Structure formats: C-alpha cells, structure tokens
Amino acid sequence: MATPHNEGGGLYAGGLCGINTIVKHFDVISDKQIILFSCGLADPEDPENVAHIESGLEKVLTPEMREKIRQFHLRGGIDYSRLGLTHKAMMAMLRRVMLKKGYDNLRSEDQMMLDTYGGTVDFTNRESLAPLLNYVRSLP
C-alpha cells in the first residue's frame, strides 16, 4: 500500500506556505496518501474563511491534485514580537486595509485582528486535531 506523505504550512492571506513543494513534486508523490494541513488565524469553522482558503488552493492545485489530496484546516495563533520584517510589513498592510473599511464595517474576526494587533493571540485547540489524527490512523 502507498505510504502517506504529509505536508503542512501556515496560511498567509489565503496562500499556503509550502504548497509549491507538493505542486513541484506531485508526479513523485501522487501514488501516496497525501495529507495537506494548514494553520492560520482564520477560523476554519467559518464557511467564508474556508471558501477563501479553497479559492487560494484552486489557483495552484490542479483538479487531479485536489481530488487526490486530503485537506485539513486548523486554527493557530500569532505573536507579533516573533514576526520577521516581511511578515510584520504584511500584517501592517492588512491592518491599513481594514482600517480604511472602518471598524464597524468589519467582520467580528477582522475586528478581533485589529484589537489584538501588535500583541499575542492563540486560537490553537488540540481537540481540532482529532479529524486529522483519526484520518491518519485509518490509513492502511
């Protein structure tokens, strides 16, 4: 039976860090059970967030890849003090875009991002790993 191959990465504005590794080597790993997991600030229980993540993946994964790859989306956290210059600049740009929209016009999740900007927030929940772990355990 095919050996599993897993790949996970952080979400940055809907794009998945490391996804190009799967795309580049898909022909080599396509006979394996491929598991892709993402981790980001966006709540994966929110259908709008999932649609945004899926939209980003559709831009880089072919229909064959999407059919073959089992996906799991998890929620993480952020500690601004540990961000590098590039990521700090990205977050500052995102903040400016949100501020232009007006606080009251933002979704509650975006308001929370503004409220915690520059600090530390952690949404990790070990229980949310259960579907991923159960899937891995079910593999032959």
Where are these regions (language model features)?
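Glycine-rich, N-terminal phosphate-binding loop of Rossmann-like dinucleotide-binding domains
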Residues: 7-11
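FMN-binding flavodoxin-like domain, especially the glycine-rich phosphate-binding loop
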Residues: 4, 14-140
